[in-house]
Amino acid sequence: SLEADYARYCDSVGKKYNEEYAFKVLDLFPNFFRPGIIDILKNIKKKKKKNRLIKVIIYTNNMGPHYWTVFIRKYLERKVGKVFDYIISGYKPGTNINKRTTHQKTVPDILRCTGLNKETKFLFIDDQQHNRMVHEKVTYMKIHPYNYGIQFKTLVDKYMASNLINILPKKERETFKFYILNYLSAGLIGYNYKVTKQEISKKDLKEEQRLSKFIEVFIKNKNTRRKKKRKTISRKSKKRY
């Protein structure tokens, strides 16, 4: 069957496939990530060095496996260094992946999953409306959704033209291309993939600037900083004899 043949060829790739290789595959398609996200994360990292109270959380409703979110975090940190403090992945009842109690995004769940105190103030950035994140401790930034797609043939051709294909013997490459294209085109990846946008728009670039500025203002705002508790030192009067 097509699925069996596809699995066989993927297995031959998988024997030499590792995390670093997967990172290099992602490097072929930088537009899969929102424009400017790497520079934004680098800037946040600089801010964190000056203020250890700044924490960065990945809070996602993606229902893929937890390791996929971890993989994306590792990929981004490969570019910018350690920047994320917590990952809160999709709610999966009956598992111990995290301490979420609902599919909805909520402040109580963030506190439960991270252990942060209830006085913590958040900048919440999302392209969807999450009503339970409208909260006195939350500055909510709803951003324009970023969509970018590649036709399967373009995606496969770019991969085949890179040196990453060298993990397969030359005599097997065209056969691999045939099976992977047919597998993708047959809709066997588990969901309906539609390419609606294949270029970065002016709106995407403007949103990058707006996002950078919003983060900068939030971090600078004294009212959004957590204050460190000062130790009170009692001074005893010295007795002179």
Q: Each predicted region: which residue ranges?
A:
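Alpha-helical substrate-recognition element adjacent to the catalytic core
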Residues: 1-95
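C-terminal cap/substrate-recognition subdomain and adjoining C-terminal extension
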Residues: 65-239
